[in-house]
């Protein structure tokens, strides 16, 4: 039976994390390796799907490894092809979510089918819908999609005991950047504004180091490493490590032996990257985060001096230059009370607790990050809902026809901030037909936008004259139909079963190898201690198991393993009994010797002694 608990998942670009409410506090669930975060990496090898640390470790040698898929979620037409099979970003994300779901279930000891999943605050509707689809494919009922900065504010605010304050959350992750301004007080978490860049994060900082290394190596050796896939993967790993090292030390050594080969033989890469050089390489990336901070403050109607706390979120906020920049822009020393890698998952778990009723007196008021509207005459974008409007929300406006006797109107739904429709993102199109013939401007067409608590959009158009209505729920522009999602769910389940079966096979083979080793050792220990018939029986059973192993007959291996286990167990009991008997005999012998010793004492001769003074002769 499924648990009533709702897990909180931070589905990150480079790393993911999961948490659950434990009493009145959220708690991170560690993965099978014991780590608190899991690399968002999927690899395909020999028909097997690997996720997390094990997938990341073999990325250098396996070209069928997918990382940072979150950067493409909701992207129309984007697919990754491995061994002739294409995967959408939703499917790859679902593999990560399935893995997280499985180890969360192992931790809780019960099935989990409900989750709160976080997304960057600046994700548009199609990206949110695609994230929800990924959860569904993984077998999760996604109860809520919440924004990452909002989630981290929940993790922070839970310990503030209802204190009234305005906070700015600066969230720089592996692939996305968000900034949100919130007002906290009496258990109410109200988002005042949000801004960001969905294509800016730690990956971009890594890329700056990679580009620098490629340029330096080309200058030194005349070889372009950017054309070598395996070398690039090694460079990526080295760049990520150097970036992390430079958060704690002033220079990082980058050493990659045998990175390539030239006419004279193997070539090695040896470089020292100082923090000053790194800051110079990435200065433009840090600067790109400034405008969103200023815009978020402006939209919230606040100045930097009115912010009480600045919360840093995301692994990339460990970069000293980022921390210094935020301090300069806000005039505040950033608050380091929450772990930037874990806060989002913890906050998602709090939201899960709110939904189940385990967390009381917490109200979350989030906002839509981008304006929503439709295309009107002349290709103009007419907004119906402005950005930073608190959700859920609903807004309607009446439009009319642009031509006489127009029988239908096309509703082109858009999201963005640009004045012209062509410059904004299309969320969907639908048509309201059978409009009665009338001069232009006469028909009354009411267009209504609804945004639900997940930030997902529903649009309807109604002819007020006839009452005829047409509705659309905006689907992800990556175009997954319900049938496709159902098919992917089925495939994910089948893969899960196949992976489970494969693991059982590996476990069985390991158990067989171990049993054969144990049998050989036991038989050696029993030489001359049990009858030849018993030894032969064990050897025959061992040979039967070895034959089943050689024939790769799994059913026979199971049966023969059980047979041999019983025989070896019986022999081991005999060996143990013999050892006990030998100990008993030894103890009896010791007692007998003790008796003899006592008898000897009776014949002891008492002698006289005289104390001699060694100095007597010298006196």
Swiss-Prot record:
Phosphothreonine: modified positions: 176
Protein name in the entry: Chaperone protein DnaK
Induction cue: By stress conditions e.g. heat shock.
Gene3D superfamilies per record: 1.20.1270.10, 3.30.420.40, Actin, Chain A, domain 4, Substrate Binding Domain Of DNAk, Chain A, domain 1
InterPro entries: ATPase_NBD (IPR043129), Chaperone_DnaK (IPR012725), Heat_shock_70_CS (IPR018181), HSP70_C_sf (IPR029048), HSP70_peptide-bd_sf (IPR029047), Hsp_70_fam (IPR013126)
Lineage: Bacteria, Bacillati, Bacillota, Bacilli, Lactobacillales
Similarity comment: family membership: Belongs to the heat shock protein 70 family.
Superkingdom in the source lineage: Bacteria
Keyword Phosphoprotein on entry: yes
Residue span of region Disordered: 579-619
Residue spans of biased composition, Low complexity class: 579-596
The keyword Nucleotide-binding belongs to this UniProt entry's keyword annotation: yes
Listed GO MF terms: ATP binding; ATP-dependent protein folding chaperone; unfolded protein binding
Sequence ranges of Acidic residues compositional bias: 608-619
Pfam families registered for this protein in UniProt: HSP70
Xref: HAMAP family: DnaK (MF_00332)
Free-text function comment from the UniProt entry: Acts as a chaperone.
Keywords: ATP-binding, Chaperone, Nucleotide-binding, Phosphoprotein, Stress response
């Amino acid at each position: 039976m499924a648990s009533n608990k709702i897990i909180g998942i931070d589905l990150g670009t480079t790393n993911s994390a999961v948490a659950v409410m434990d009493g009145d506090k959220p708690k991170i669930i560690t993965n099978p390796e014991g780590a608190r975060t899991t690399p968002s990496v999927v690899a395909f090898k020999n028909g097997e799907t690997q996720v997390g640390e094990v997938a990341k470790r073999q990325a250098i040698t396996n070209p069928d490894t997918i990382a940072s898929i979150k950067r493409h979620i909701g992207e129309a037409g984007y697919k990754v092809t491995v061994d002739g099979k294409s995967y959408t970003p939703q499917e790859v994300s679902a593999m990560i979510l399935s893995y997280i779901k499985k180890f969360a279930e192992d931790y809780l000891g019960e099935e989990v089918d409900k989750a709160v999943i976080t997304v960057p605050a600046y994700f548009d509707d199609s990206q949110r819908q695609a994230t929800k689809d990924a959860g569904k494919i993984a077998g999760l009922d996604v109860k809520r999609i919440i924004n990452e900065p909002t989630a981290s504010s929940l993790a922070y605010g839970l310990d503030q005991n209802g204190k009234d304050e305005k906070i700015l959350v600066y969230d720089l992750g592996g692939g996305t950047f968000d900034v949100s301004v919130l007002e906290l007080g009496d258990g109410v978490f109200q988002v005042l504004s949000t801004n960001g860049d969905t294509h800016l994060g730690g990956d971009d900082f890594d890329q700056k180091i990679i580009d620098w290394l490629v340029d330096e190596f080309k200058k030194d050796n005349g070889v372009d490493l950017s054309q070598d896939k395996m070398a690039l993967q090694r460079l990526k790993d080295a760049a990520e490590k150097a970036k992390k090292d430079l958060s704690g030390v002033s220079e990082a050594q980058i050493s990659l032996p045998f990175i390539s080969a030239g006419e004279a033989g193997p070539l090695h890469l040896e470089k020292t990257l100082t923090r000053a050089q790194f800051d110079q390489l990435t200065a433009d990336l840090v600067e790109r985060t400034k405008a969103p901070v200023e815009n978020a403050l402006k939209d919230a109607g606040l100045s930097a001096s009115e912010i009480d706390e600045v919360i840093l979120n995301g692994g990339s906020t460990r970069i000293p230059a980022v921390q210094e920049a935020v301090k300069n822009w806000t005039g505040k020393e950033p608050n380091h009370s929450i772990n930037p890698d874990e806060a989002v998952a913890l906050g998602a778990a709090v939201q899960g607790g709110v939904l189940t009723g385990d967390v009381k007196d917490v109200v979350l008021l989030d906002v839509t990050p981008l304006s929503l509207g439709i295309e009107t005459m002349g290709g103009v974008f007419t907004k119906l809902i402005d950005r930073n409007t608190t959700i859920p929300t609903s807004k309607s406006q009446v439009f009319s026809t642009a031509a006489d006797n127009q029988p239908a109107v096309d509703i082109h739904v858009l999201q963005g901030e640009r004045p012209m429709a062509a410059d904004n993102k299309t969320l969907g199109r639908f048509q309201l037909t059978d409009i009665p013939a009338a001069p232009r401007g006469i028909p009354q067409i009411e267009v209504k936008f609804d945004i639900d608590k997940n930030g997902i959009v529903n649009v309807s158009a109604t002819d007020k004259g006839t009452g005829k209505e047409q509705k659309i729920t905006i689907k992800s522009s990556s175009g997954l139909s319900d049938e496709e999602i159902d098919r992917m769910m089925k495939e994910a389940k089948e893969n899960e079963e196949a992976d489970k079966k494969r693991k059982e096979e590996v476990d069985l083979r390991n158990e067989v190898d171990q049993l054969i080793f144990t049998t050989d050792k036991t038989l050696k220990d029993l030489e001359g201690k049990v009858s030849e018939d018993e030894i032969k029986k064990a050897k025959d059973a061992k040979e039967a198991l070895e034959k089943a192993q050689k024939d790769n007959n799994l059913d026979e291996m199971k049966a023969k393993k059980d047979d041999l286990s019983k025989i070896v167990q019986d022999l081991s009991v005999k060996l143990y009994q013999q050892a006990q008997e030998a100990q008993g005999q030894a103890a009896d012998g010791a007692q007998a010797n003790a008796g003899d010793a006592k008898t000897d004492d009776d014949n002891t001769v008492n002698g006289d002694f005289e104390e001699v003074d060694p100095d007597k002769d010298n006196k």
